[in-house]
């Protein structure tokens, strides 16, 4: 006997990050209750996403145009390339409006535990972009995890033979953070990355 449409909706929602079975059930009930607005709008948005989204062949961003709006922006600095693990990281950095260069999405990070090797990531495409000679600085914007830092070191090794400056995002104290609430690793990194005030 096949599952009901409601059960299928709950199962589909439950696979999303941050939604367990209970949250998925609540979300499904909300959508059903508001089916004239919320459910219809969600279904329409999902259909549009399915029909129009493209993975940019240049950087790996997800957009509705090819190349993506970032890669096709002539105001961006071609000499700066920011390497991120996932599209969500690209979106977060771009939303800050503090980086005006290009991006490269790896599609994950190296992880022996999860069996993710360099071949599973777009590291070869990154090296080809650097080989083009246009890029003068590569900013490694990996997460401050063991896997993120392992990935950053691997990329550094891959790029060290090219005439490109390799930098990494600073890690340390969050704005508004209090010292007694920070973990030892964050405090140690903040101390190592300290800079003069004048």
Swiss-Prot record:
One of its GO terms (molecular function) is zinc ion binding. It holds the Pfam family RecR_C. Residues 79-174 form the Toprim domain. A zinc finger (C4-type) spans 56-71. Keywords: DNA damage, DNA recombination, DNA repair, Metal-binding, Zinc, Zinc-finger. PANTHER family: RECOMBINATION PROTEIN RECR. Belongs to the RecR family. NCBIfam families: recR. May play a role in DNA repair. It seems to be involved in an RecBC-independent recombinational process of DNA repair. It may act with RecF and RecO. This is Recombination protein RecR. It comes from Zymomonas mobilis subsp. mobilis (strain ATCC 31821 / ZM4 / CP4).
